[in-house]
C-alpha cells in the first residue's frame, strides 16, 4: 500500500503499486491529460513506471519549462529516429540526446542529406506525431536488448550496450510503433505532446567525438510545448543568424579563418583595433584594482607540466614539440607560469596579497568539429590573473574580483548576469576547515554585495570552490565568461611558499580569476550583442568625413586630419561618388558618425553630423564635435540607441 506524498504535503493512499499517470488520474482528468512524467523522490520516471513503496511525487506536466520541456525534446529526437528509419531503412542510428534549446540525432547514412531532405523528414515527423501514437516502454535484459538491435543491424546501439551498459542492467526500450530506441528516459506517454517542433540544420560529427572514428550526419532540431514559444525561438534564431559574428566579421573586415590554420584567428586591422581597445580597457582595470602585469613563456618543458599535474589530465589537449631530446608543451593556461614567477625570491606575508595578471597567449587542441569562428578556437588570449593570498585574505580578494567583474560587464551593457557557486566535491584536496572557510568567504562576498546566486552542491573542482558568472545577451543566450576559482592544490604541487608572521613556511591560497575569459570569444560575443554597431570607443572607425563635390575635398581632408590628430579614428572619403551612395556604404560599415561637408559647412567651418542609425544631429563647429566625441569615447558610453 504505497502512500504518495504530493508537493503540497497532501497524501494519497493506494492499495497496489501505482504509476504517476494513475496518481494524476486520481486527482483529476485535466492533470492526467497534461502529465508527461513524474519525479519520484527527486528522480525522474516515466508516467507509466510503477511506484511500489511510499514516496514523494511531483507530477511533470506541460507547464514544466525545464524537465517537462527536456522530456518533450528527447521524445522528439526519438520521433526523428522513427521518421528517418521509415524514409531511410538502411540508416544506422547512433545517439539522439537533448541539448540547450533542442535535440539532435547522429546517423550513419551513405547518402548526404540536403535541406530538401530535411523538409521531407520533418513532414514525415508531422504525419507521425498527428496520430498521437502511444510510446510503450519495456525494460528488458541486456541480452534481449542486444539481440533486438542485432536483428535490426543497429551496430552503434550494440556498441553502446557492449561498452556502456552493465550485463546485469535492464535497459529501457521505447517502442514507437515499429521503431525501437534505447534510452534511460523518461519519455512522453504519447506523441500528442510532440506537436511543436522544427528541424534546423545538418552537420558532420565523429562517432563518440573521436576523429579516428567515422563521420556521421547530425540532424539538429528544436521543440516547445506550444506554437507561440516555438515561433518566438525561431525568430530569435533568425536574428542570431543576422548577428552571426562570422558574417559580420567578414562584412566589417575584422578577421578571417582559413584551413591552413584551423582554430587560429587572422586579425585584420579593424578587428585588431577592437582587440587592442579591449586590452587597454582591461589594463586600466588592472591598475585600478592593484594588479601587476606579467608575461610568461609560451612553451615550457614537459617536466613542469608533469609536476603541475596537467600532463596526466590534459595531455591530449596540449600541443607539444621536442628539441635537443627535450619535450615541450605550448601552454594551454597561464597558472603554472605565474607560480614560477611567484617562486622567484623569498615572499613574506607582508607581500600578500600579490595580484598577477597576464594577457596570456594560450593554445588548446580542440577537436576540429567543435571549432566555431572566433568563439571556439585553438589559439586564444586569456585575460588571466592569479592572486596569491593568505586564508584570512580570501574574502577581501574575492570581493574585489566580483566588483571588477561587474564593473567590466556593465561597461559593455550586460545587465543580466547569473551567478553560480560550486561547492566541495566528494573527492578533493585540502582540509574540511579550509573548505569551510573558503566556501563561507565566497558566500559572504556575494551576500555583502547583494548578488543573488545559486549554489551547485558538489560541483566545485577537486582543488577548490568557485564562482561562475554567466552573461545573458540581447537574444537571451547564455555565455559563461567570468570565473573566480580558489586553488589549494597547484601552489602545493609547484612549491609556492611564503614566510608567515612566526617565521614559518606557509603555502598561499591561489585564486584564479578571469573576466572576459578569452578575448577572441568575448569579441565574438560583442559582435553578436551589438550586431556590429560597436560603441564609439570600440568602433574600428569612429567617424568618416564625406564631401559632396570635389570643391570640398581639401576641407574634408583637413577635417579628417584634425580628427586624427585628436586621437579619433577617422578618415576622409573623397571618392567621386554621390553623397547618398557614400553615406549608405558607411552606414553598412556601422561607422558611428558621418560628417558631411558641403559648401555651407566649408564656408562656416562646420560639419553636418549624421549617425549610422540615420539620425541628423545638425551642424557642429569642428572643435565642438571633437569635444563631443572625445567625451563619448573617454566615458565609454554605450550609445547603442543613438
Swiss-Prot record:
Keywords in alphabetical order: Aminoacyl-tRNA synthetase, ATP-binding, Cytoplasm, Ligase, Metal-binding, Nucleotide-binding, Protein biosynthesis, RNA-binding, tRNA-binding, Zinc
Protein name per its UniProtKB record: Threonine--tRNA ligase
NCBIfam families per record: thrS
Enzyme Commission no: 6.1.1.3
Pfam families, sorted: HGTP_anticodon, TGS, tRNA-synt_2b, tRNA_SAD
Known catalytic reactions: tRNA(Thr) + L-threonine + ATP = L-threonyl-tRNA(Thr) + AMP + diphosphate + H(+)
UniProt keyword annotation of tRNA-binding present: yes
Enzyme kind, highest EC tier: ligase
Residues the record lists as binding Zn(2+): 335, 386, 512
Region (Catalytic): 244-535
Keyword DNA damage: no
Subunit structure: Homodimer.
CDD domains, alphabetized: TGS_ThrRS, ThrRS_anticodon, ThrRS_core
Organism expressing this protein natively: Vibrio cholerae serotype O1 (strain ATCC 39315 / El Tor Inaba N16961)
Subcellular location as annotated: Cytoplasm
GO CC list: cytosol
GO molecular function: ATP binding; metal ion binding; threonine-tRNA ligase activity; tRNA binding
Coiled coil: none
Co-factor: note: Binds 1 zinc ion per subunit.
GO biological process: threonyl-tRNA aminoacylation
Co-factor(s): Zn(2+)
Functional note: Catalyzes the attachment of threonine to tRNA(Thr) in a two-step reaction: L-threonine is first activated by ATP to form Thr-AMP and then transferred to the acceptor end of tRNA(Thr). Also edits incorrectly charged L-seryl-tRNA(Thr).
Domain TGS stretches: 1-61
Cited InterPro entries: aa-tRNA-synt_IIb, aa-tRNA-synth_II, aa-tRNA-synth_II/BPL/LPL, Anticodon-bd, Anticodon-bd_dom_sf, Beta-grasp_dom_sf, TGS, TGS-like
Amino acid at each position: 500500500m504505497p502512500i504518495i506524498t504530493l508537493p503540497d504535503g497532501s497524501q494519497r493512499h493506494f492499495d497496489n503499486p501505482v504509476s504517476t499517470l494513475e496518481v494524476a488520474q486520481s486527482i483529476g482528468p485535466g492533470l492526467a491529460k497534461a502529465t508527461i512524467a513524474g519525479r519520484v523522490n527527486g528522480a525522474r520516471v516515466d508516467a507509466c513506471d510503477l511506484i511500489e513503496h511510499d514516496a514523494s511525487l511531483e507530477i511533470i506536466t506541460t507547464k514544466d519549462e525545464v524537465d517537462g520541456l527536456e522530456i518533450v525534446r528527447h521524445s522528439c529526437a526519438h520521433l526523428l529516429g522513427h521518421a528517418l528509419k521509415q524514409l531511410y531503412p538502411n540508416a544506422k542510428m547512433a545517439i539522439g540526446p537533448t541539448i540547450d534549446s533542442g535535440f539532435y540525432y547522429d546517423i550513419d547514412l551513405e547518402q548526404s542529406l540536403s535541406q530538401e531532405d530535411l523538409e521531407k523528414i520533418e513532414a514525415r515527423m508531422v504525419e507521425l506525431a498527428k496520430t498521437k501514437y502511444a510510446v510503450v516502454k519495456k525494460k528488458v535484459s541486456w541480452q534481449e536488448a542486444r539481440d533486438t538491435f542485432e536483428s535490426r543491424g543497429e551496430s552503434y546501439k550494440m556498441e553502446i550496450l557492449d561498452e556502456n551498459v552493465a550485463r546485469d542492467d535492464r535497459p529501457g526500450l521505447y517502442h514507437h510503433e515499429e521503431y525501437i530506441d534505447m534510452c534511460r528516459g523518461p519519455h512522453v506517454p504519447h506523441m500528442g505532446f510532440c506537436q511543436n517542433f522544427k528541424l534546423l540544420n545538418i552537420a558532420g560529427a565523429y562517432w563518440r567525438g573521436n576523429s579516428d572514428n567515422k563521420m556521421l550526419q547530425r540532424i539538429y532540431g528544436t521543440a516547445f510545448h506550444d506554437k507561440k514559444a516555438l515561433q518566438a525561438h525561431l525568430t530569435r534564431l533568425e536574428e542570431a543568424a543576422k548577428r552571426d559574428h562570422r558574417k559580420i566579421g567578414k562584412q566589417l573586415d575584422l578577421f578571417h579563418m582559413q584551413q591552413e590554420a584551423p582554430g587560429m584567428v587572422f586579425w585584420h586591422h579593424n578587428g585588431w583595433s577592437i582587440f587592442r581597445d579591449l586590452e587597454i580597457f582591461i589594463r586600466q582595470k588592472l591598475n585600478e584594482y592593484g594588479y601587476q602585469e606579467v608575461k610568461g613563456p609560451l612553451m615550457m618543458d614537459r617536466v613542469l607540466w608533469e609536476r603541475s599535474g596537467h600532463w596526466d589530465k590534459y595531455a591530449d589537449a596540449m600541443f607539444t614539440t621536442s628539441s635537443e631530446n627535450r619535450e615541450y608543451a605550448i601552454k594551454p593556461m597561464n597558472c603554472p607560469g605565474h607560480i614560477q614567477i611567484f617562486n622567484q625570491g623569498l615572499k613574506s606575508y607582508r607581500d600578500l596579497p600579490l595580484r598577477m595578471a597576464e594577457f596570456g597567449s594560450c593554445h588548446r587542441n580542440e577537436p576540429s568539429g567543435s571549432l566555431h569562428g572566433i568563439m571556439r578556437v585553438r589559439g586564444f588570449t586569456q585575460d588571466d590573473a592569479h592572486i596569491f593570498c593568505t586564508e584570512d585574505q580570501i574574502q577581501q580578494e574575492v570581493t574585489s574580483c566580483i566588483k571588477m567583474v561587474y564593473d567590466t560587464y556593465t561597461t559593455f551593457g550586460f545587465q543580466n548576469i547569473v551567478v553560480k557557486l560550486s561547492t566541495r566535491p566528494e573527492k578533493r584536496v585540502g582540509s574540511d576547515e579550509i573548505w569551510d572557510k573558503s566556501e563561507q568567504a565566497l558566500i559572504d562576498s556575494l551576500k555583502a554585495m547583494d548578488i543573488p546566486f545559486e549554489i551547485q552542491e558538489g560541483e566545485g573542482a577537486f582543488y577548490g570552490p568557485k564562482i561562475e558568472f554567466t552573461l545573458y545577451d540581447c537574444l537571451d543566450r547564455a555565455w559563461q565568461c567570468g570565473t573566480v576559482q580558489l586553488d589549494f592544490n597547484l601552489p602545493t604541487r609547484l612549491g609556492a611558499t611564503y614566510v608567515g608572521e612566526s617565521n614559518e613556511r606557509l603555502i598561499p591560497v591561489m585564486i584564479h580569476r578571469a573576466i572576459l575569459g578569452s578575448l577572441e570569444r568575448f569579441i565574438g560575443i560583442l559582435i553578436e550583442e551589438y550586431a556590429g554597431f560597436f560603441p564609439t570607443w570600440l568602433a574600428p572607425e569612429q567617424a568618416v568625413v564625406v564631401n559632396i563635390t570635389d570643391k570640398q575635398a581639401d576641407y574634408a581632408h583637413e577635417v579628417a586630419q584634425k580628427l586624427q590628430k585628436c586621437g579619433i579614428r577617422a578618415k576622409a572619403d573623397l571618392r567621386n561618388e554621390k553623397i547618398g551612395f557614400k553615406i549608405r556604404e558607411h552606414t553598412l560599415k556601422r561607422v558611428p558618425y558621418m560628417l558631411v561637408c558641403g559648401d555651407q559647412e566649408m564656408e562656416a567651418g562646420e560639419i553636418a553630423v549624421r549617425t549610422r542609425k540615420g539620425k541628423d544631429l545638425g551642424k557642429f563647429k569642428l572643435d565642438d564635435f571633437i569635444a563631443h566625441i572625445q567625451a563619448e569615447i573617454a566615458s565609454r558610453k554605450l550609445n547603442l540607441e543613438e
